[in-house]
């Protein structure tokens, strides 16, 4: 979906008990030996911190700050195919927010997100609750199977589904054909968003499930063991106790999913060649920015679109965090 | 955990219906699991089946069942020898990218995460808070400027163009920092210092061993990130000899679709996809305990 | 993406690059070791190395042939990407001012775009004008602007109709010579077998060049453009010829007489081999494509001239075609020009590979009109000498200008065709909508547009 999803788990990590034990005994024996840090120690401390953070700082500056600054500078200039380029302040941004291509793309990903995100996170939550509760062999298979698509490059995933959606030899159409329902054009206008949503759901449900599962595993068992003794069923325990207790993890996955959805790019790009009259160059805002730069050589305007999208994402996620502040602070 | 063999006795009559309902519940849960397994497995199943077919069978037989005679080994043989064995080369490239970036990114993230958690230094808060904003930037926005900047130092179209940007893993830093805060008490480090250990020794001998699950997690996820990365190498590399698998397979597929005539290539793309995802799935399966450990340490039943 | 071409043939194995045995360390060292480019041989007396981007696999042998016959210049071939992927990389490298090859394979319709970004070297300064008479007239006009030569033509795509002789016999169809007959036969066929179609209307971006070729035949000349006359450009995408084509095909689509599968799909390929499509309206490179995609229908196909709008007419169109251009980033303009001119040029050895294995349609006069090409019999077409259809078609193609924003125009056209297919807009308004969008885009890009 986007790079950020590939970057790693978004789950907070609970501490290891064994570590705490070790730390406890180690520290206990030494408590008396504590001393106040001298000036030289503090300087050394500071130097050490700087030293350790330097590689990251350099990379951060080189591959994030510098490109961003450069892109921002680009976005303040206007260039045309004929006539060269000039500094134009925020003209590109003004154009962005009245550009029907950009706005229709934003609308499309919002509509897409409103349906796909609840379905995917709903499935992920359901899966997480199941594997938290059931320890059978089936549950283990279930856990790994759902997670497997995460290991598949998005390019290959979309390519596989491209074959599966085929009207001639795809299994979906064989099925509807056999049932006498006729062909279903999964890559046509009306179903394309659904088909894309299916790919994303397939790819990311397992990952989100594992994150939520990790949060569930971090809950103190006693709370709901007690509830069970009180006669609450598994379903009730799950809905009334477990779900509220991991609400911060849910909010977190929700936020990352929203960010990813707004940046929707890889799947439509991979399906684009096979359905180019449906997936137009402005299909999603990110695809639009990509095509502007790489197909039409409109680097400046493309940079402005990207920044505008970044701003939408930024504001969107902060609003979201603000709105769910209470909920996420529950824990 | 809630097995049937729960302590039974001392029950009243109202217990009976609940047992029934929970049995029904178990059936429902199992049915849900089986249905979801089938759905999530289906594309993999298709891939395995399709990889055993030749071109004719691929486009004329039922998609989800085998066709005899199969040509799995022919497909593999062709996959590994096509165009001078470029697939193997791409695989090697991918391993290099993922290996170096994975180890490098983990090291960088560990040092930085540890520093953020345990040291105070100028710029600490600014850097850390901008780290979270970093993930909001769409990758496409960075692609062009990064390309232009790298080309100024003549690094585009080299392996470094893929490796260097992949070393930056803000999430890894975040994860390590949280992990260090939660599982590495100051007292432990302080005690080692009192014992006369230098800062480096504290880091390598005291902190790192404790952080192992987090490191494995960061390593695995950054390797997967690089292994699966498509956009960055697509933009950075012009030379097919430097392509990773994702870009290489895409170029085969693109060629098959557009230059057409590419009968052979469809089977190659399919067999190539299967071979490309196997290492990752195996890695995830084998290392399951470690990476799940990274996520869930401390709360195992 | 912009055109459906480049047949790929039998698996040609690369022996030179024994990548299999390259150890990981070796690859790593080689790749990480140094900067990027070749050709900096400077003072040393070894041969000059010219880096060439091209994407069809048979090119390997052509390069080997060139390197065998040249001492001072050697070609290093790189497959940077297929079609649009290659153009994307070229544009990015040009923007960066670094990283472009010396010589690059470009389809004709991309030339003005790259030229406008100052990416193409004027080979006229290095003697390329001497080649003028070696190439078909209309092709030379596509690559030059007066004495400025921006590319050397390689192959073209004169259009014709390939058809399944066996199906035509089975359903008693007549080989259509006009588009009106084509429609009648299409109705007859579809009635006889509701699962079969006369052909497939290419609605995707891959087929944008196909649609443009058909309009070309119908007399449409949407652009009046020459780099030397900037910023003037004439844009008329809704002229009578263009409208005639969409009215006609829109009618066939609405009556379900043709299929509407995207060309860049496996389903389309399958349709060609399964008998779902009775004809394939394609270009001079099409036989290679068809014979490898629909291998099992070998011997059943024949080639006939493109149906005409008026009975007895001789209007032709072109779909696709490529050239070799030299980029402005080359450090060896002289040698690069030589490579562009001589890789194929009039070399019979190179063209033998091009014709027999890559199924290229030569635009080089001596080859095109030579008996080897003209009289060649094709088993796939039941021994027919198909070039006796294609060569006259090639000679009937008139002049045609492309725009320097062809990607935008093709994408816009594809989007609007998609809307019409979906019933969101009328077929009759497609051309007008495209015209509106493209002219306003051009105006915004600083062109002085005359409509």
Q: Where do the language-model regions lie?
A:
Chain C
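Short, well-ordered beta-strand elements
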Residues: 44-57, 73-79, 102-103, 150, ...
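Hinge/lid segment of periplasmic solute-binding proteins
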Residues: 108-159, 210-216, 302-304, 388, ...
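Extracytoplasmic "Venus flytrap"/periplasmic binding protein-like
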Residues: 65-135, 169-177, 269-271, 275-279, ...
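Glycine-centered hinge/linker elements that transmit conformational signals in sensory
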Residues: 186, 231-261, 306
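Short, low-complexity disordered leader/linker segments with a strong preference
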Residues: 1-50, 68, 128, 439-451
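Extracytoplasmic/periplasmic solute-binding protein
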Residues: 148-154, 159, 183-234, 277
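C-terminal lobe and pocket-closing loops
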Residues: 112, 286-297, 310-411, 443-451
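A structural signal for short loop-to-beta-strand junctions that line the ligand-binding cleft
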Residues: 100-102, 131-167, 197, 313-317, ...
């Amino acid at each position: 979906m986007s790079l950020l999803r590939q970057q790693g788990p978004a789950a907070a990590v609970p501490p290891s008990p064994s570590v705490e034990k070790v730390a406890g005994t180690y520290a206990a024996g030494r408590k008396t030996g504590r001393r106040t840090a001298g000036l030289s120690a503090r300087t050394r401390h500071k130097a050490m911190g700087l030293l350790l953070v330097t590689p990251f700082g350099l990379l951060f500056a080189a591959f994030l700050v510098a490109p961003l600054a450069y892109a921002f500078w680009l976005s303040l200039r206007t260039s045309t195919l004929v006539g060269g380029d000039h500094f134009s302040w925020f003209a590109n941004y003004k154009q962005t927010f009245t550009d029907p291509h950009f706005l229709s793309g934003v609308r499309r990903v919002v509509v897409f997100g409103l349906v796909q995100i609840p379905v995917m996170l709903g499935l992920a939550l359901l899966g997480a609750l199941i594997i938290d509760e059931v320890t059978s062999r089936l549950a283990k298979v279930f856990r790994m199977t759902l997670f497997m698509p995460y290991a598949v490059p998005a390019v290959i995933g979309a390519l596989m589904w491209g074959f599966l959606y085929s009207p001639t030899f795809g299994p979906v159409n064989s099925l509807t054909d056999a049932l006498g329902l006729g062909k279903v054009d999964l890559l046509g206008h009306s179903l394309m968003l659904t088909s894309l949503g299916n790919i994303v759901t397939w790819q990311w449900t397992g990952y989100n499930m594992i994150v939520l599962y990790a949060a569930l595993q971090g809950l103190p068992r006693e709370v709901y063991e007690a509830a069970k003794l009180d006669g609450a069923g598994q379903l009730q325990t799950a809905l009334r106790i477990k779900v509220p207790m991991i609400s911060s993890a849910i909010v977190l996955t929700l936020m990352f999913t929203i960010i990813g959805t707004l940046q929707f790019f890889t799947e439509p790009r991979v399906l684009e060649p096979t359905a180019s009259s449906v997936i137009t160059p402005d299909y999603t805002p990110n695809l639009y920015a990509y095509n502007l730069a790489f197909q039409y050589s409109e680097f400046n305007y493309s940079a402005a679109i990207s920044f505008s999208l970044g701003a939408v994402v930024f504001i969107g996620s902060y609003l979201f965090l603000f709105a769910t502040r209470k909920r996420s602070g529950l824990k | 955990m809630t097995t049937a063999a729960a302590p039974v006795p001392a029950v009243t009559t109202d217990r009976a219906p609940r047992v029934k309902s929970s049995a029904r519940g178990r059936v429902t849960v199992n049915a849900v699991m089986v249905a979801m397994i089938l759905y999530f497995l289906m594309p993999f199943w298709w891939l395995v089946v399709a990889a055993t077919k030749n071109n004719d069978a691929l486009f004329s037989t039922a998609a989800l069942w085998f066709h005899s005679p199969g040509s799995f080994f022919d497909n593999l043989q062709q996959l590994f020898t096509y165009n001078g064995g470029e697939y193997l080369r791409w695989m090697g490239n991918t391993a290099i990218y993922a290996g170096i970036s994975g180890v490098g990114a983990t090291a960088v993230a560990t040092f930085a995460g540890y520093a953020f958690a345990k040291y105070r230094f100028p710029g600490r808060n600014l850097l850390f808070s901008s780290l979270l904003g970093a993930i909001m930037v769409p990758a496409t926005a960075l692609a062009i400027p990064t390309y232009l900047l790298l080309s100024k130092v003549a690094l585009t179209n080299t392996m470094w163009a893929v490796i260097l940007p992949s070393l930056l893993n803000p999430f890894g830093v975040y994860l390590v920092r949280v992990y260090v805060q939660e599982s590495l008490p100051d007292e432990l480090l302080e005690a080692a210092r009192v014992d006369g250990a230098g800062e480096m020794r504290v880091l390598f001998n005291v902190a790192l061993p404790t952080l192992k699950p987090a490191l494995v997690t960061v390593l695995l996820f950054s390797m997967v990130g690089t292994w699966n990365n498509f956009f960055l190498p697509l933009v950075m590399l012009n030379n097919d000899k430097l392509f990773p698998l994702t870009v290489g397979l895409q170029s085969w597929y693109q060629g098959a679709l557009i230059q057409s005539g590419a009968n052979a290539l469809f089977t190659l793309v399919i067999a190539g996809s299967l071979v490309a995802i196997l290492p990752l799935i195996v890695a995830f399966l084998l290392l399951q305990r470690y990476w799940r450990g990274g996520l869930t340490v401390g709360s195992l039943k | 993406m912009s055109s459906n071409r480049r047949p790929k043939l039998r698996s040609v194995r690369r022996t030179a690059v024994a990548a299999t045995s390259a150890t990981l360390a070796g690859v790593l060292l080689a790749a990480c070791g140094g900067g990027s480019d070749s050709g900096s041989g400077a003072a040393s007396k070894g041969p000059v190395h010219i880096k060439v981007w091209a994407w069809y696999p048979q090119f390997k042998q052509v390069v080997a042939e060139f390197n065998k016959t040249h001492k001072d210049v050697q070609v290093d071939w790189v497959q940077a990407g297929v079609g649009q992927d290659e153009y994307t990389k070229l544009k990015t490298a040009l923007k960066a001012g670094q990283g472009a090859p010396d010589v690059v394979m470009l389809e004709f319709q991309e030339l003005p775009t790259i030229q406008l970004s100052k990416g193409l070297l004027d080979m006229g300064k290095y003697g390329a004008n001497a080649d003028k008479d070696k190439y078909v007239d209309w092709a030379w006009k596509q690559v030059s602007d007066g004495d400025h030569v921006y590319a050397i033509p390689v192959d073209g795509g004169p259009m014709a109709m390939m058809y399944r002789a066996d199906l035509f016999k089975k359903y008693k169809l007549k080989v259509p010579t006009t588009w009106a007959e084509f429609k009648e036969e299409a109705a007859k066929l579809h009635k006889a077998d509701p699962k079969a179609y006369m052909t497939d209307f290419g609605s995707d971006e891959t087929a944008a060049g196909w649609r443009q070729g058909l309009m070309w035949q119908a007399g449409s000349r949407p652009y009046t453009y020459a780099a030397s006359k900037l910023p003037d450009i004439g844009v008329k995408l809704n002229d009578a010829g263009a409208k005639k084509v969409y009215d006609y095909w829109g009618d066939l689509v609405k009556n379900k007489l043709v299929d509407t599968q995207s060309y860049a799909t496996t389903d389309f390929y399958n349709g060609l081999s399964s008998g779902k499509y009775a004809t394939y309206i394609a270009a001079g490179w099409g036989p290679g494509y068809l014979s490898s995609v629909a291998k099992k229908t070998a011997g059943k196909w024949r080639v006939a001239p493109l149906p005409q709008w008026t009975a007895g007419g001789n209007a032709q169109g072109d779909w696709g075609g490529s050239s070799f251009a030299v980029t402005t980033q080359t450090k060896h303009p002289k040698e690069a020009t030589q490579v562009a001119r001589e890789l194929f040029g009039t070399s019979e050895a190179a063209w033998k590979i091009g014709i027999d294995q890559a199924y290229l349609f030569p635009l080089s006069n001596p080859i095109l009109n030579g008996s080897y090409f003209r009289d060649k019999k094709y088993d796939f077409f039941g021994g027919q000498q198909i070039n006796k259809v294609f060569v006259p078609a090639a000679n009937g193609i008139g002049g045609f200008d492309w725009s320097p924003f062809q990607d935008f125009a093709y994408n816009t056209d594809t989007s609007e065709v998609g809307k019409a297919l979906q019933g969101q807009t009328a077929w009759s308004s497609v051309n007008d909508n495209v015209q509106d969008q493209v002219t306003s885009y051009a105006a915004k890009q600083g062109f002085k547009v005359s409509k």
